[in-house]
């Protein structure tokens, strides 16, 4: 019996079981239950589900692989994400929970941005919903590609299409049946698994196999040739963390700005049972991020000294976690550790799928097509859309055309687009009483345009500065200046602000 595969499969059977429990016990009675868990999530579930949905397989493959190949200068993105995570929990979490409740009990971010200013216009809600629907469908397609890549690496005898379809079925099943609550609970356990897996590998290496650590490997320059292009890449570990260029440092730290506008993370703040629970959630989330990122760095550091030549001469740096797990753990435990990689991929994909579905039903279907739709109908449409978006994402991910490749390339910039478009607007809506609807529209539109323009004109490549940095700055200035020099918000919007910022708001 192959214990690695058996353990791997058993883990996902348990995940599906969780979804079925939520489905058959009648947890999802209405759209707020399905899309926001009835605002009943506890502090631990809120914290770990938010972090698991944030950190995809990049945490276990991309980050350690990059550091393994090029040294500690690659850590700046991780540092930016850690700072951004902490700032998001400290600045936004509690306020967004109270503001979304005060703003007509909003269950999506586009709905919140409209209700927050108490206006009749649905233009901003429409624009935001369309951006969400498009971007998150592509995001899910990207997650399918990433998950399939991991799946076929672990199980090379399985064809990519079968692997992708199996991966899709797992995601769709517990999203469709379980809704937000099931997604949060499964992401909670997956968050624990991801952190445990990341911690266990360097601990076992350091305390059990330190004799294998070869410091000279840090000085050796390895190189590999890309089979497709013939390009030769040299992998020098380089100097310390400050060996990076100023552009890499600014761009890496700029990644942290994305959190303020990332819907599938912000919606976790809206779902917690009580605002007073946010403090505990914040502590848990920040500790999780610091430990997980530090562990990923140590995996790369130890991996370079133990199997740098084996991995880097073949361009397999992203497989360092897999290789270390298989080298130092028995098959049963290894299967669980490898499940953490797939868990990281699906914990991101399921959240994005649910946000896209909720945005369609709450921000497009009900306001524009079926204003009188019942809760039962809305819930059904949401579930159907989970299936539809999944199939579209599957088709995109399976496409071999250049157009599909261009779309997949755009996904890498979606984080910047969300952060630039929505980050400043969300922050100002939570902290500035004078902020108004026109300022919000200006912030969203200008941030998106500058972010996209910076990318399409080649400025990201020529300057080396990540597009979220200028996009966020321009969006913030536009939102502030337009709101400052246009009419003040109406009395209802001011009342919402005052209600949400009361000292006893809970």
Cite the ranges covered by each PLM segment.
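Membrane-embedded helix-loop-helix hairpins and adjacent transmembrane boundary segments
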Residues: 1-506
């Amino acid at each position: 019996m192959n214990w690695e595969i058996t353990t791997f499969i058993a883990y996902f059977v348990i995940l599906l079981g969780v979804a079925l429990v939520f489905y058959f016990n009648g947890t999802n009675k209405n759209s707020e239950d399905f899309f926001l868990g009835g605002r009943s999530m506890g502090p631990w579930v809120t914290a770990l589900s938010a972090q698991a949905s944030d950190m995809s397989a990049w945490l276990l493959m991309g980050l350690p692989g990059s550091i393994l190949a090029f040294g500690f200068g690659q850590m700046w993105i991780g540092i930016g994400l850690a700072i951004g995570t902490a700032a998001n929990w400290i600045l936004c979490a509690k306020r967004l929970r109270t503001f979304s409740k005060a703003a007509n009990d909003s269950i999506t971010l586009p709905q919140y941005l409209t209700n927050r200013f108490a206006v009749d216009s649905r233009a901003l809600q429409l624009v935001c919903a369309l951006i969400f629907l498009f971007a998150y469908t592509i995001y899910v397609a990207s997650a399918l590609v990433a998950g399939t890549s991991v799946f076929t690496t672990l199980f090379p005898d399985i064809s990519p299409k079968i692997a992708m379809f199996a991966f899709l079925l797992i995601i769709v099943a517990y999203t469709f049946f379980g809704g937000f609550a099931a997604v949060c609970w499964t992401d909670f356990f997956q968050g624990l698994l991801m952190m445990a897996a990341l911690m266990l590998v360097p601990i076992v290496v350091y305390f059990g196999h330190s004799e294998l650590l070869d410091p000279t490997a840090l000085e050796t320059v390895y190189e590999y040739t890309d089979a497709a292009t013939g390009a030769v890449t040299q992998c020098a570990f380089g100097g310390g963390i400050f060996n990076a260029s100023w552009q890499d440092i600014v761009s890496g730290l700029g990644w942290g700005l994305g959190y303020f506008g990332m819907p599938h993370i912000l919606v976790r703040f809206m779902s917690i049972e009580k605002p007073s629970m946010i403090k505990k959630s914040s502590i848990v989330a920040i500790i999780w991020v610091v430990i997980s990122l530090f562990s990923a760095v140590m995996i790369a550091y130890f991996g370079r000294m133990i199997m740098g030549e084996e991995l880097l001469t073949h361009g397999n740096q992203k497989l360092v976690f897999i290789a270390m797990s298989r080298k130092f753990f028995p098959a049963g435990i290894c299967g669980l550790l490898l499940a953490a990689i797939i868990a990281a991929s699906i914990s991101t994909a399921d959240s994005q799928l649910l946000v896209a579905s909720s945005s369609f039903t709450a921000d497009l279907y009900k306001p524009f097509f079926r204003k009188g739709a019942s809760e039962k109908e809305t819930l059904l449409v949401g579930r159907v859309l989970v299936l539809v978006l999944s199939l579209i994402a599957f088709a995109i991910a399976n496409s071999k055309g250049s157009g599909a490749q261009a779309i997949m390339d755009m996904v890498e910039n979606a984080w910047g687009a969300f952060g630039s478009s929505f980050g400043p607007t969300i922050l100002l809506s939570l902290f500035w009483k004078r902020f108004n609807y026109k300022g919000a529209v200006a912030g969203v539109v200008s941030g998106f345009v500058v972010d996209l323009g910076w990318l399409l004109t080649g400025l990201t490549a020529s300057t080396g500065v990540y597009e979220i940095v200028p996009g966020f700055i321009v969006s913030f200035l536009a939102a502030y200046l337009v709101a400052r020099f246009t009419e003040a918000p109406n009395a209802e919007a001011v009342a919402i602000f005052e209600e949400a910022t009361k000292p006893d708001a809970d």
